[in-house]
């Protein structure tokens, strides 16, 4: 029983050591922190705010009309989803 525990411990320790060595050699090839941060905070053109002719959900609708599928709330002056109690 002690032999089995020792062999499991050595196997686990060997796997951890292998992981650490592989990670260290991989992180030397590239600057991991800078690369990771730049990929996280990269701004894609699809996600940039675009100017529209209509106001989207929860946008102010005083000067602009709401986009299709939304109505201008008479109380808050925001574009909201149409609902039976808002008609």
Curated annotation (Swiss-Prot):
GO terms for molecular function: ion channel inhibitor activity; toxin activity. Residues 25-52 form a propeptide. Expressed by the venom gland. Keywords: Disulfide bond, Ion channel impairing toxin, Knottin, Secreted, Signal, Toxin. Disulfide bonds join 54-67, 61-72, 66-79. SUPFAM superfamilies: omega toxin-like. Pfam families: Toxin_12. It is found in: Secreted. Its main location: secreted. One of its GO terms (cellular component) is extracellular region. Coiled coil: none annotated. Residues 1-24 form the signal peptide. Belongs to the neurotoxin 10 (Hwtx-1) family. 51 (Hntx-8) subfamily. Hntx-8 sub-subfamily. Ion channel inhibitor. The presence of a 'disulfide through disulfide knot' structurally defines this protein as a knottin. This is U3-theraphotoxin-Hhn1a 6. It comes from Cyriopagopus hainanus (Chinese bird spider).
């Amino acid at each position: 029983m002690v032999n089995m525990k020792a062999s499991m411990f050595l196997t686990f320790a060997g796997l951890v050591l292998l992981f650490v060595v592989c990670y260290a050699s991989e992180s030397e090839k590239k600057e991991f922190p800078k690369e990771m941060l730049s990929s996280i905070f990269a701004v894609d053109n699809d996600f940039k705010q675009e100017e529209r002719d209509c106001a989207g959900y929860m946008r102010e609708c005083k000067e602009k009309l709401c986009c299709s599928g939304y109505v201008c709330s008479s109380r808050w002056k925001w574009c909201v989803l149409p609902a039976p109690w808002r008609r």
